[in-house]
Amino acid sequence: MLVHLFRVGIRGGPVPRWSLQSLRFQTFSAARSSDDQFSSCLLRAVAQLRSQLRAHLPRSPPASHRSTSAWCWVGGTLVVPAVLWQHPRFCLIALCEAKGSPPAQPTRARELRFKWKLFWHFLHPHLLALGLAIVLALGAALVNVQIPLLLGQLVEIVAKYTREHVGSFVSESRRLSIQLLLLYGVQGLLTFGYLVLLSHMGERMAMDMRKALFSSLLRQDIAFFDAKKTGQLVSRLTTDVQEFKSSFKLVISQGLRSSTQVIGSLMTLSILSPRLTLMLAVVTPALMGVGTLMGSGLRKLSRQCQEQIARATGVADEALGSVRTVRAFAMEKREEERYQAELESCCCKAEELGRGIALFQGLSNIAFNCMVLGTLFIGGSLVAGQQLKGGDLMSFLVASQTVQRSMASLSVLFGQVVRGLSAGARVFEYMSLSPVIPLTGGYSIPSKDLRGSITFQNVSFSYPCRPGFNVLKNFTLKLPPGKIVALVGQSGGGKTTVASLLERFYDPTAGVVTLDGHDLRTLDPSWLRGQVIGFISQEPVLFATTIMENIRFGKLDASDEEVYTAARKANAHEFISSFPDGYSTVVGERGTTLSGGQKQRLAIARALIKRPTVLILDEATSALDAESERIVQEALDRASAGRTVLVIAHRLSTVRAAHSIIVMANGQVCEAGTHEELLQKGGLYAELIRRQALDASLPSAPPAEKPEDHRSCQ
C-alpha cells in the first residue's frame, strides 16, 4: 500500500474534479491483498491517522481546486514516518478508531492536594496559643532588627575614640552596651515563650490528627482494606503526621520569624542607604522566582519519597506480622532482600530529593555571599566618597547578614515545608474519605420481634478490587430461624463471601439480602454486627491483652459473671482457670501464647457473650487436631442451640447434623438437601464425601483431584 501511495504521489495526485473519497477508494482498492482483514484494518487506520494529523497541525487556507502534485506526496512520505517515530500515539489513535474502539488513555497518578479546610478544623481550637506564639515570634524578630542599629552606633563610638582619643570609651559606650544586653535578654525570653507554645500546640494538633485519622480508617469499608496495605496506613498515622507537625512548627518558629526579620531589616537598610538597598531589591525577586520553579519539582520528589517509605513499611509489617510463616519456610533471606530492595528505592528517592534541596541551598548561599561582596564593594565606595558613615556601613552589613541568615533559614525551611505539605495532603486524603457502608444509622428490629430469618434473593456480587469477576451469580438461599444451614463445596466457590454479605462487610452488586424481611441496607450495621450476628472464623484473632478483655470484646459492658458463663459454654473455663493468672493472663500478640483449640474456644466465648440471634461458623474446626476439634465441636453444638446458624465447612463430617446442606460451585447453588438426601442423589456432595473418606483411609495419598463442577450444576 505504501508503494502504491508513493506511486500515486509521483504521478501528480488527484486530477481536477476528483473527490477525495474517489481517490481514497482508488488507493484502497489498489492496496487490497490476500490478507483482506489486515489490509482493511490498516487502510482504515491510515484514514483515521490523516484526521488525527489534521487535528494536530495548524489550519491552512483552503486549497485551490488543483492539488499540489507530487511534492505533497513526497513530503508526506518523508514526514509522516518521522511524525509516527516521535508521536506513536497518532498511530495508536488511528488504529483504535479504525477498529471502532477508543484508545487507551494513559493513567496518571492523581495529585494530592492539601485540604486547607481540614487543616483549619484542627488549628481552630489552638488559635489563642497560636496568636500568642506569633506575637512573641514577631517580638523576637523585631528585637533582632534593632540590634544592627545599636551595633552601628557602637562602632561609631569606637571609630571616634580611635581617631580623636577624647573622652572615656567606657562611659560613652555604657548606655549602648546596656541596651544591647537588654535586647539580648528580651530576645531570649521571647524565643523561649513562643517555642514552648508551639511545642504544646503542635503536639496537641498531632494527637488530634492521629485520633481523627485512626477513627476515619476504622470506619472505612472492608473493600478499602482489601486494596491497601497495613504498613502504608500505619505510615500515614505515624511518619506523615510527624512530618507535618514538624513542618508546621518550623513555619511559625523559623518561617514567621525569618520573614519578619527580612522585612524589618530591609526597611532598616532602605533608611541607611537607599542605593545599596536598591541593589538588594533587584536581586531578591530573581532569587525568589528561581526558588519557586525549583519548588514544584521538589514537591513531586517529596511525595514519591513518602510513598516509597510507606511501601517499605508495608513490606516490613507484613514480614514481621507473619514471622512464623517466614520462619517455617526459611524465607528470612528472601524477606530481607524484599525489604532491602524497597529501602534501596526509598534511599534513591531520598537522595534525589536531598540533592535537589542541596542544590537549592547551595545556589542560595552563593547568591547571598555575592550580595555581601557587592555590598562591601559599593558601600566602601560610598564611605570613601563620604556619602555614608562607617558606622552606618557596619549597621548595613549586620542588617544584610540578618537578611542573609533569615533567607538561608527560609531556604532550608522551604524543603521542610514541601515535605510537610505533601505529608499533610496524604494524611488529609484518608481523613476525608467517606465509607460507602456507614457504621451506624438505620432501623433496629426490636428484640421481641427478632426471629433470625435470613434470605438471599438473586444475589450477585464481585469484589471491588476485582470488579469484572462475579463470585456469586444469581445466588438464592433461605436460612429459616433457629435452623442450621451448612455451605460446602470447593474452595473459591463463594462460601465465605456469603458470610461477608450477611455481616454486610459488602453490599451485593445485584439482588437483596434480608433479615426478617428487612433489607440489610436499611438496618443499622452497628446493631447488626454488635448484637445480632456472632462470627467465629477459622483463624480467630485475639488482641495482646488479658483473656478477660478478649472475651469482653464481644460486649464491652459485660460483667465478670457473664464472661465466666460464656467461657463455660465455650468449654474454655477449665483451661483458663489452670493458668496462674487465670482470666488476667495476657495472651500475647494475636494470641501466640495459646494453642489453636484454646484460641478457638476464646473466640466462641467472645461470640456467645453478646447472645447473638445469628451465628456464623466459618470453618471453625478445620485447623484443629482431633481432640481439640471434639472439644470445640461440643462448644459449637451447645452454642448453636436455638439460633440461626450458617456453617461454612470443609470437613463434611461436621455438617451431617445440619438441617440443610447447600453445595456451592462457581458462585451458585448446585445441590441442596439433608445429608441423606444428597447422598441418595449421588451428585457433587456424594463425590466430595467419597473422596474425603478415601483421603482419610489413605493418609499418605496425594491430594485428591477436584471433582468437575458440571456434575450437578446444570
From Swiss-Prot:
Domain ABC transmembrane type-1 per the UniProt entry, residue ranges: 132-419
Q: Per the database record, which ranges form the ABC transporter domain?
A: 454-691
Q: Would the keyword Transit peptide be found if you checked this record's keyword annotation?
A: yes
Where primarily located?
mitochondrion
Which residues are listed for ATP binding in this entry?
G489, Q490, S491, G492, G493, G494, K495, T496
Residue stretch of the organelle transit peptide: 1-25
Please cite one Gene Ontology biological process associated with this protein.
transmembrane transport
Which UniProt key words apply to this protein? ATP-binding, Ion transport, Membrane, Mitochondrion, Mitochondrion inner membrane, Nucleotide-binding, Potassium, Potassium transport, Transit peptide, Transmembrane, Transmembrane helix, Transport
Q: In which tissues is it expressed?
A: Strong expression is found in the heart, brain and testis. In the testis, expressed both in the somatic Sertoli cells and peritubular cells and in the germline (spermatogonia and pachytene spermatocytes). Also expressed in the lung, liver, intestine and kidney.
State the compartments where it is located.
Mitochondrion inner membrane
Residues annotated as coiled-coil are none
The UniProt note on how this protein's activity is regulated states: Channel activity inhibited by ATP via ABCB8/MITOSUR subunit.
Q: Transmembrane segments in this chain: where?
A: 127-147, 178-198, 278-298, 365-385
Gene Ontology MF term list:
ABC-type transporter activity; ATP binding; ATP hydrolysis activity; ATPase-coupled transmembrane transporter activity
A Pfam match is: ABC_membrane
Subunit info here reads: The mitochondrial potassium channel (mitoK(ATP)) is composed of 4 subunits of CCDC51/MITOK and 4 subunits of ABCB8/MITOSUR. Physically interacts with PAAT. Interacts with Neuropilin-1 (NRP1) in mitochondria.
> Which family would the database say this protein is a member of?
Belongs to the ABC transporter superfamily. ABCB family. Multidrug resistance exporter (TC 3.A.1.201) subfamily.
Q: What does this protein do?
A: ATP-binding subunit of the mitochondrial ATP-gated potassium channel (mitoK(ATP)). v. An increase in ATP intracellular levels closes the channel, inhibiting K(+) transport, whereas a decrease in ATP levels enhances K(+) uptake in the mitochondrial matrix. Plays a role in mitochondrial iron transport. Required for maintenance of normal cardiac function, possibly by influencing mitochondrial iron export and regulating the maturation of cytosolic iron sulfur cluster-containing enzymes.
What is the name listed in the Swiss-Prot or TrEMBL entry for this protein?
A: Mitochondrial potassium channel ATP-binding subunit
What taxonomic ancestry is recorded? Eukaryota, Metazoa, Chordata, Craniata, Vertebrata
Provide the gene name from the record: Abcb8
